């Protein structure tokens, strides 16, 4: 399972609006086209955390579908609520991705 964690800033009180945008989008074809199998949204003060889970790295599909009407639409709708974590250093979506520096999994051997 591949996981990507997107980090950004979010407007105060915007969590319900952001959730609604994704709820509507997740009923469409976009998650299937990108390969998303699970999405979780988190908030810590004004920090927006978006965990995307998929069978493989979705970056190539996201790059390919960046011009797709649904992708552009969700990006435009989110722009009212979500901004770059550090606008001075943001150049592309990869600049919003957190870097995993540790992972542990329980050994399932009994």
Q: What are the residue ranges of the model-derived segments?
A:
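Short, low-order "capping/linker" segments at domain edges
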Residues: 85-110
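An amphipathic, aromatic/His-enriched active-site/gating alpha helix that lines ligand/cofactor pockets
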Residues: 29-36, 55-92
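Short, surface-exposed charged micro-motifs
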Residues: 40, 51
């Amino acid at each position: 399972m591949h996981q990507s964690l997107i980090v950004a800033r979010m407007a105060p009180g915007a969590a319900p609006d952001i959730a609604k945008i994704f709820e509507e989008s997740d009923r469409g074809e976009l998650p299937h086209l990108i390969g998303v199998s699970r999405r979780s949204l988190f908030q810590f003060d004004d920090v927006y955390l978006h965990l995307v889970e998929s069978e493989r790295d979705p970056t190539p599909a996201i790059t390919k579908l960046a011009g797709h009407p649904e992708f552009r639409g969700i990006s435009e709708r989110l722009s009212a609520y979500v901004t770059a974590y550090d606008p001075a250093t943001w150049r592309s979506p990869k600049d919003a991705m957190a870097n995993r520096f540790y992972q542990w999994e329980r050994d399932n051997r009994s």
